């Protein structure tokens, strides 16, 4: 890994490998709440943060944290409509990726549900 000289707060001290960044990308999708948000947006196209809070039945702060992660990683994008922030999936391939993962899971759900290695890594 190489050292980056910039002092920007958005610059890493070292450059992660492509594999590390890809794993982080999938961890962004690896949260049940974030997947629920993406499913809701995929079904309806655009939703306000308030509507997502209502549909998910979670505290506003929790939903906002997950939306922030999804936005930062490029999974969703926003626009303002008066006082509301409206969210939508940033790229149709995100929805396709989630749909593909669900289709693959259909063939292997029992094994994935019983996987202790993934649970141990996230603890």
What are these regions (language model features)?
Residues 13-61, 81-94:
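N-terminal helix-turn-helix DNA-binding core of bacterial DNA-binding proteins
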Residues 1-21, 43, 91-123:
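Amphipathic alpha-helical dimerization/coiled-coil segments
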Residues 54, 71-72:
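Alpha-helical residues within the helix-turn-helix
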Residues 22, 72-73:
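A generic local structural motif
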Residues 61-63, 119:
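A short, surface-exposed loop/turn module that caps and links secondary-structure elements
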Residues 66:
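Residues within the DNA-recognition helix of helix-turn-helix
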